[in-house]
Amino acid sequence: MQQDKVNLLGLNQKAIEDFFISIGEKKFHARQVFKWIHKKGVIDFDAMTDLGKNLRHKLKEKAQITIPKVVFSKASKDGTHKWLIDVGGSAVETVFIPEEGRGTLCVSSQVGCTLNCSFCSTGKQGFNRNLSAAEVIAQLWIAARTLSKTDGEHDFTVTNIVMMGMGEPLMNFENVVPAMDIMMDDLAYGLSRRKVTLSTSGVVPRIYDLLEQSGVSLAVSLHAPNDMLRNEIVPINKKYNIDELLEACKLYAQKGPHKHITFEYTLMEEVNDNLSDAEELVALLKSREVPAKINLIPFNPYPGTPYKKPSNNRIHRFKEFLQHNGFVTTVRKTRGDDIDAACGQLAGDVMDKTNRKQRYLKKLGDTNAN
């Protein structure tokens, strides 16, 4: 029985070294291949010119470097890029957002999501499966290859990663952490821990694990100033409440790379955007002594949602109150609306479990027909 070939794409440096030792080869050859894949973007063993012929032949027998297919990609007039990537009959989306002096890649970790936050379009798809480490890092590999040129107006260079795409990354810990290891490896993409941010809805035990095993920057999707409201819109709060979450955040801020936690707060009209909500949020964060920056995200409506985007006046009032009380506060700019890439639209068409594959196959067929 033929043994399945190992996909080297998702192996971090230690794992690829272990693989090479298992096939009777030396560690330094593993580092050579690792660098070819991620630093140089080469996935053909025969093109790895510093490897001997016998080693290249052995690798072709025992290993492969498999990149998922891009079903389609779109570029917005504001420079935002979005890719729909085939992951074995389903699809995930990856978004690149260029800004002055930086380029941020938003990476997905699951097909769908397990957490079912009431306002999130991805949650309406239901949950299919976790992505493999190879499927996670492939999103950066694809983006880095695609964005290696400049169009004269935008500088398309990935300088920052945010694990804020489809899915809850801490529910796919075993695959996300090795992928982030590759992102931060100097032989690969060389990003610092400060430049890789994982966003979680509050899987508290895994926050402690993340601090111990990775220590990347942490963002927390808070969205509510009290347990009653958060139980309703972020259901995982029923398992790990705000007190438990903020206790973990306080420790992470003490030992993590930024010495603060970024709290994301999606503003929904007459749900959590009242001045009383802002007052409660300030009191909460001050009483728990969590060093915090706050990123306000105006809700982006999608078909079938009951929630609405607040007026600019309400958004400004909320922001001003937080700033007046000493919190560094930003309002996320809406980007990529013309390609459905803005935050809250990562699911594109809202797909549930029953029609996700049919719509995916239709898009694949339409793409192949063009």
UniProtKB/Swiss-Prot annotation:
GO molecular function: 4 iron, 4 sulfur cluster binding; metal ion binding; rRNA (adenine(2503)-C2-)-methyltransferase activity; rRNA binding; tRNA (adenine(37)-C2)-methyltransferase activity; tRNA binding
Subcellular location: Cytoplasm
Binding-site residues for S-adenosyl-L-methionine, renumbered to this chain: 167-168, 199, 221-223, 300
Classification via NCBIfam families: rRNA_mod_RlmN
Stated name of the protein: Dual-specificity RNA methyltransferase RlmN
Cofactor annotation remark: Binds 1 [4Fe-4S] cluster. The cluster is coordinated with 3 cysteines and an exchangeable S-adenosyl-L-methionine.
EC code: 2.1.1.192
GO BP, sorted A to Z: rRNA base methylation; tRNA methylation
HAMAP family for the chain: RNA_methyltr_RlmN
Active site, UniProt feature: 93 (proton acceptor), 343 (s-methylcysteine intermediate)
SS bonds (residue pairs): 106-343
Organism listed in the record: Francisella tularensis subsp. novicida (strain U112)
Function: Specifically methylates position 2 of adenine 2503 in 23S rRNA and position 2 of adenine 37 in tRNAs. m2A2503 modification seems to play a crucial role in the proofreading step occurring at the peptidyl transferase center and thus would serve to optimize ribosomal fidelity.
Cellular component, GO annotation: cytoplasm
